[in-house]
A protein has these predicted regions:
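Intrinsically disordered, low-complexity terminal tails/loops enriched in metal-binding residues
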Residues: 3-210
């Protein structure tokens, strides 16, 4: 029990340090070292074990193989955009959004049940809208604004259908001048698409979707 408490306090300290200014050089070096450890595969397992976030199940439990594959493919291009924004790469974000739109345009809606179609249609139109806006955006800051909106609807889509694996719903309180924003991740390790290379570890896991 004592070791678990220490582990939780350690993770909390990392999150606090990551979300504050980087002017304290010696502290930053320690934080960067600990963050790199958290990004490794073995450390991610430890981090997951200490995350105090609710786990939710996808609403639809009997999705067809074709539909599940489509939702997973849309999610993969969402993560493509996310990783590009983490790296401040506007061009690659556009590439991810372009591929997302291609996948959506090729999907056969007749594969969906009536309830599935209602849930899918409600959010996929907004996903398409903001993916298109990311393609047309002139800079990475504008792309991040649209990504925040896209993330809201991608979150609802994955809550409904799942993604074939565990997905983490993250929050950064400092994004957009402390208005805050959310995003989805394939890993418990925080990689912030809104703060980019400036503060990539700022944020926390709010939910886990299975």
């Amino acid at each position: 029990m004592k070791q678990l408490v220490i582990a939780i306090l350690a993770v909390s300290s990392i999150s606090f340090a990551a979300c504050n200014s980087g002017n304290q050089t010696s502290e930053n070096k320690d934080t960067m070292s600990m963050d790199k450890m958290a990004m490794s595969d073995t450390s991610s397992t430890t981090l997951t074990a200490t995350i105090d976030a609710p786990v939710i199940k996808a609403s639809f439990t009997n999705v067809s193989t074709d539909v599940a594959a489509h939702i997973a493919e849309v999610a993969s291009h969402y993560f493509h955009i996310k990783h590009a924004l983490v790296s401040n790469d506007s061009t690659e974000a556009k590439n991810g959004a372009t591929m997302m739109l291609q996948v959506i345009s090729q999907f056969d809606n007749s594969l969906l049940s009536a309830d599935e179609k209602a849930a899918y249609t409600e959010h996929i139109s907004a996903i398409k809208e903001h993916a298109d806006a990311i393609i047309k955006s002139a800079d990475v800051d504008a792309q991040r604004m649209h990504f925040a909106e896209l993330s809201m609807h991608e979150y609802e889509l994955i809550k409904a259908f799942g993604a074939g694996k565990k997905i983490y719903y993250d929050h950064c309180p400092m994004a957009f001048n402390s208005k805050g924003a959310n995003w989805l991740s394939e890993s418990a390790a925080i990689q912030n698409p809104y703060m980019g290379t400036k503060m990539p570890e700022c944020g926390s896991v709010e939910q886990v979707i299975e």
